[in-house]
Amino acid sequence: MTKIAFTGGGTVGHVSVNLSLIPTALSQGYEALYIGSKNGIEREMIESQLPEIKYYPISSGKLRRYISLENAKDVFKVLKGILDARKVLKKEKPDLLFSKGGFVSVPVVIAAKSLNIPTIIHESDLTPGLANKIALKFAKKIYTTFEETLNYLPKEKADFIGATIREDLKNGNAHNGYQLTGFNENKKVLLVMGGSLGSKKLNSIIRENLDALLQQYQVIHLTGKGLKDAQVKKSGYIQYEFVKEDLTDLLAITDTVISRAGSNAIYEFLTLRIPMLLVPLGLDQSRGDQIDNANHFADKGYAKAIDEEQLTAQILLQELNEMEQERTRIINNMKSYEQSYTKEALFDKMIKDALN
């Protein structure tokens, strides 16, 4: 029986692809295990949503693009992580490693290479992240979500596969969504998602604009951990820090979304044909990958995008109003998108690429 080790973490985006793939792997008769950090979000998500597979925590450092004394400490954490990962891989003897990226993945990929275990990397963003750039030297193949990403990668190692979307995405129950929120079925629903870390600025602007927004929408506000404001209570407005199992039901009642521009999330909105206003993480908080993703989706006619630095209460309302006027055009553009690979076909390709 083929055994696949999965790794990736640090953000929800670095875990969600694995969460979508592992159930398919298990249903096809593959064995699966997960290697991640000791305290990262990946541990919480994998252990709670896939308790049937083994989770192995390892030491991990953070990859920084700036000079810091912490970089020296993290070198030792990465070295320890390589040793930790080697122990796991020697014990489990997987046939291949699938790496979604994030800083925890680098020591695992290096350890796999030292044991001659082939690695397949997945890159969700338009431009490759630092972890995947490093890991690519030790990997056999890298799969991309965006076809344009191939321009940044060695031709012999890179293949475009499109987005991988979790199976339950389209199974959301609108009735359950309305019951959860207590919303009126005859009024539009706006979903606001600030990413796994939340966005204090976006949260502030939503609350500042709440009365105006509630004239047109009912609002589901995913604030991020620790960012709920218990003092804000209005009819047609509900806050959650983070939603797991119920998210598909909330998406089933969503008409419009305001969101960060992580690749996995925006491809889910695209699959569901939900018009989106994207507010990507700025260069002060990231390497600019979300800016690239947002601009790409805007250019394709799937979304509208605005830089967080330019975001004001007035501009938010203006952009939403313009998007509502273009709603039919946006949804028609979304209908042209087709998924490149089924998950079953992707695993066939993965096994062939890794083991041949």
From Swiss-Prot:
Keyword Amino-acid biosynthesis in annotation: no
Location within or outside the cell: Cell membrane
Highest taxon in the source lineage: Bacteria
Molecular function terms from GO: glycosyltransferase activity; undecaprenyldiphospho-muramoylpentapeptide beta-N-acetylglucosaminyltransferase activity
Coiled-coil intervals, chain numbering: none
Keywords, sorted A to Z: Cell cycle, Cell division, Cell membrane, Cell shape, Cell wall biogenesis/degradation, Glycosyltransferase, Membrane, Peptidoglycan synthesis, Transferase
Pathway linked to the protein: Cell wall biogenesis; peptidoglycan biosynthesis
Predominant location: membrane
E.C. number: 2.4.1.227
SUPFAM superfamilies listed in its UniProt record: UDP-Glycosyltransferase/glycogen phosphorylase (SSF53756)
Binding site for UDP-N-acetyl-alpha-D-glucosamine: 166, 196, 290
Top EC group: transferase
InterPro entries to which the protein is assigned, alphabetical: GlcNAc_MurG, Glyco_trans_28_C, GlycoTrans_28_N
Catalytic activity: Mur2Ac(oyl-L-Ala-gamma-D-Glu-L-Lys-D-Ala-D-Ala)-di-trans,octa-cis-undecaprenyl diphosphate + UDP-N-acetyl-alpha-D-glucosamine = beta-D-GlcNAc-(1->4)-Mur2Ac(oyl-L-Ala-gamma-D-Glu-L-Lys-D-Ala-D-Ala)-di-trans,octa-cis-undecaprenyl diphosphate + UDP + H(+)
Membrane topology, from the record: Peripheral membrane protein
Keyword Membrane in annotation: yes
Protein's GO biological process: carbohydrate metabolic process; cell division; cell wall organization; lipid glycosylation; peptidoglycan biosynthetic process; regulation of cell shape
NCBIfam families linked to this entry: PRK12446.1
Family statement: Belongs to the glycosyltransferase 28 family. MurG subfamily.
Known role: Cell wall formation. Catalyzes the transfer of a GlcNAc subunit on undecaprenyl-pyrophosphoryl-MurNAc-pentapeptide (lipid intermediate I) to form undecaprenyl-pyrophosphoryl-MurNAc-(pentapeptide)GlcNAc (lipid intermediate II).
PANTHER family listed in its UniProt record: UDP-N-ACETYLGLUCOSAMINE--N-ACETYLMURAMYL-(PENTAPEPTIDE) PYROPHOSPHORYL-UNDECAPRENOL N-ACETYLGLUCOSAMINE TRANSFERASE, UDP-N-ACETYLGLUCOSAMINE--N-ACETYLMURAMYL-(PENTAPEPTIDE) PYROPHOSPHORYL-UNDECAPRENOL N-ACETYLGLUCOSAMINE TRANSFERASE 1
Designated name of the protein: UDP-N-acetylglucosamine--N-acetylmuramyl-(pentapeptide) pyrophosphoryl-undecaprenol N-acetylglucosamine transferase
Organism: Staphylococcus aureus (strain NCTC 8325 / PS 47)
Gene that encodes it: murG
